């Protein structure tokens, strides 16, 4: 989903919420654009978050700054401590809620050995292939 897709969906259908993936939609700026547009149409945002602590921290910053947050999706490994060794200070929970990181930037700092432990790999484009009518195909 991109900003334009989100706009078309909100304007042309009766949706209650959108689930943008902040890492594939274009980051925090694009995510905020979608959230603000959705807010103007009484649509909630539920950020899709299947990735690691950087994605989670970015989503939490967006969640803290929009009035139309529905709920924040968390990947399972976020709950079992697997992400903790990726960052210097693990994301924290209190009373069943994830706390918004308050450090500079998005609130986290990668562990010194994160690049060595989790080397980057090239990924293909996440852009969906479209049929002549705009429908997603081969997804």
Language model: regions and residue ranges:
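Shared catalytic-loop signature of beta/alpha-barrel
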Residues: 4-104
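Extended hydrophobic packing segments that form well-structured cores
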Residues: 106-139
């Amino acid at each position: 989903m991109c900003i334009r897709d989100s706009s078309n969906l909100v304007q042309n259908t009766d949706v209650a919420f959108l689930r943008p993936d902040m890492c594939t939609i274009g980051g925090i700026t694009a995510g905020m654009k979608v959230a603000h547009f959705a807010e103007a149409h009484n649509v909630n945002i539920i950020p899709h978050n299947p990735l690691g602590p950087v994605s989670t921290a970015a989503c939490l910053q967006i969640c803290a700054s929009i009035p139309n947050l529905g709920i924040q999706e968390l990947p399972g490994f976020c709950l079992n401590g697997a992400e903790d060794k990726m960052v210097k200070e693990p994301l924290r929970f209190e009373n069943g809620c994830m706390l918004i990181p308050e450090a500079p930037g998005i609130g986290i700092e990668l562990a010194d050995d994160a690049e060595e432990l989790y080397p980057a790999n090239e990924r293909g484009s996440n852009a969906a292939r479209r049929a002549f009518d705009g429908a997603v195909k081969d997804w």
